[in-house]
Every structure is written in C-alpha cells, then in structure tokens.
Amino acid sequence: NPFAIFDLPIAFNVDQALLSERYLVLQKSLHPDNFVTADAQEQRIAMQKSTEVNDALKTLKDPILRAEAIIALNTGKTEDLEQKSTQDVTFLMQQLEWREELENIEQSQDENALESFAKRVKKETKEMLTALEAQLNEQQWPTAAQFCDKLRFLKKLADEISQVEERLFEL
C-alpha cells in the first residue's frame, strides 16, 4: 500500500509537498551509509525498503498509477487494470481520429496545428482526470479503471505529440 508507506490517507488528491517531505525522511533513514556496519541481511532489508519507498513514490506521483492503486486497494484486485476501454467503441474511434490527425499534422509540418492539437489533448486529459476523481469518490471501480486506460492512451498520445514537436522544430 503506497499510501501506508508514506502515512497518507487513501485519496486521489495527494499533498505533493507532504509526500516529498516524507520521502526525504524515509530515504535518509534508509540510506546505505546508515547500514555500513549492519550485517548482510539488514543491508538487504534496508535496500528492499528503499526500493519499496521509491516504487510507492512513483505510484503516488503519477495520477494513473495512484488511481489504479486506489482501485486495487478497494477491490482486492491487483491484476493489470489495462484493456478496460477496448469495449468502448466511441473511444476507439476517437483514438483513431486523434492518431490520424497527428499523422496529418506531422506530414504537413504545421506547427500551429500541432500546438492547437496539443492543447486539445491536454484539455481532454484534464477533464478525464476530473471524471476519474469523481468515479473514485463514488467508488465506481470498473468505470474508474476504464478512465485509467483512457488516460494511459492520452499520456502516450501526449508523448507522441512531444516527439513530433521535437522533429518539427529540428528542421
């Protein structure tokens, strides 16, 4: 439970400053220098705990991973939550349209169109995060998992937009 590691309530909105503060305290206490004189088992346990802290931090900093952790903690399901939106035909069509639009923008090398597209994707992501939070608050776990899958796609799309942006500005 990443929330328990940092002694935080299980919630979608996490106080990032408090998270960073607690991370630094935990990392300091688990630093290898503190275990120089310890036996091999204690060193291994400290290393393992340090890895758990790093993994928990990664989970709590990423809204998709954080939401998936909340869903898993509340449903007891720890299997991969991906592939939930593949039955959403409307979203599948939207994915195809977005990918085609990005491809056309790259081919035309239209920087203004790319900027506009990036803003629309960012807006869609923000709206979907708000909807995800509402589903989590209402304990609608299957729907929340679908939003996680959609957000994962939008994150990949944003990465692709950045790559296209880099290629366009290299010219």
Task: Locate the predicted segments by residue.
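C-terminal accessory/regulatory regions appended to core domains
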Residues: 1-171
